[in-house]
Amino acid sequence: MSRTGVLVLGPAGVGKSTFCNSMIAYMQSIGRRAHIVNLDPAANPTEYEFTIDVKDLISLQDVMEEMELGPNGGLVYCFEFLLNNLDWLDEEIGDYNDEYLIFDCPGQIELYTHIPVLPTIVRHLQTSLNFNLCATYLLEAPFIIDNSKFFSGALSAMSAMILLELPHINILSKIDLVKDEYSKKQLKKFLNPDPLLLAKQEDYINPKFAKLTQSIANLVDDFGMVQFLPLDCSKDSRSVETILSYIDDVTQWSEAQEPKEPHDEVELPDEVF
């Protein structure tokens, strides 16, 4: 039987851990079991305890102290160590077959753009552990205040889609921080990035910078791969429910579930009679 896993990616501070916690809370509320697998050797504890924590194998703080490395070099060392000890990950995942595993990944994008760390882990999960995987990439909504920054983030999302070669869902997180300043009509323009968003900006930025930003926006548009789903974890779970439905669709979660046998006898409460 295949397993289902979701990789949560994105720059530091975009709300990956909050999204993981919201996913767990919502899935528990509808009777589905899920677990967080922490792949960030520098992560702090969150609301929901990590079922599997890479810090049990190696932590960034220990590496920085013992190897005299900086944060980025230490993180690369940690993941190279993990790649050499994937049997530890296999043992920790063990018999989690019919439950969601949510992989909370570190925010350093060089782990999948510059060195093939995450792509290697993805291939291992697929081939050795029979996972159906989906990648989610979070970009925080305040990026839309600066259109050039938004398209830079969209380019990072697209690079993750291409390099990981997984079904991919992009998420515009922290939407509650901008929904009072932007109408729904304005926000929809960012959910499906359009280079025309830069038209009003060209008059007051450096011409060379404007040309570079326009080229990035056109590249994102030419590929036609990047769209975003809005995420608001502040009040209700409707956006989480919507995102989970997309994840279920691309991972074919429902098709992987074993059919449940009906009960032979149905007990009716006394008040029925």
Curated annotation (Swiss-Prot):
InterPro entries: Gpn, Gpn3, P-loop_NTPase. The keyword Metal-binding does not apply. A motif (Gly-Pro-Asn (GPN)-loop) lies at residues 70-72. GO terms for biological process: mitotic sister chromatid cohesion; protein import into nucleus. It holds the Pfam family ATP_bind_1. Keywords: GTP-binding, Hydrolase, Nucleotide-binding. GTP binds at G13, V14, G15, K16, S17, T18, S173, K174, I175, D176. GO terms for molecular function: GTP binding; GTPase activity. The keyword Lipid biosynthesis does not apply. Transmembrane segments: none annotated. The record marks N72 as: Stabilizes the phosphate intermediate. Belongs to the GPN-loop GTPase family. Small GTPase required for proper nuclear import of RNA polymerase II and III (RNAPII and RNAPIII). May act at an RNAP assembly step prior to nuclear import. Heterodimers with GPN1 or GPN2. Binds to RNA polymerase II (RNAPII). This is GPN-loop GTPase 3. It comes from Candida albicans (strain SC5314 / ATCC MYA-2876) (Yeast).
